[in-house]
Amino acid sequence: MKMVKELDAGPILFQEKFKIKENYNSEQLGLELFNIAAQNLNQTVKKIADESIKEISQDHSLATYTNMIKKSDGLINWAESGELIIRKLKAYSQWPGLYTYWNDKRIIIKDADFQKEENSEFEKNGQIIELNDKGIAIKTIDGMIHIKSLQLEGSKIMDASSFVHGRPSFISSNLN
């Protein structure tokens, strides 16, 4: 992008479309974008130097704006849809991380999947249902989050099974 006074407003000097893989988190997406930029940097700089670059004007009506990300944005609201929770996991993978609390200790979720399903009305959102072959099953408003790996504050990253076997009281408890 060509530098102008306004933020992210200059003409585009290089652009390439690619499909974002469904399982990408922000770190993986950043690495993919870095690799694309690195592969095309020399060619783009040469075109700028010999003035053969074709500037592409941005359509400012398509611009979107967001707020600054705060650490508290990573706190899971178990009343949200499981799909939204997984999107936040992908978006906040580098910072602030997606986290919840158990026994007043912060747990950072490192890897998880969502399965949409009918839930029992007797289970509470954020309740840990079981450890199964998909991970630690936690009830959401519209299904189950299956945590594959997580990190208790002050500890190393663990797979779901290792975490639960060291903390059997974790199953059936509630996260907040």
Regions found by a protein language model. Name each.
Residues 19, 75, 153:
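Short, flexible active-site loop motifs that bind/organize anionic cofactors or intermediates
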Residues 67-68, 73-84:
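Active-site loop ensemble at the mouth of alpha/beta enzyme cores that anchors a bound cofactor
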Residues 79-176:
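An anion-binding loop in the catalytic cleft
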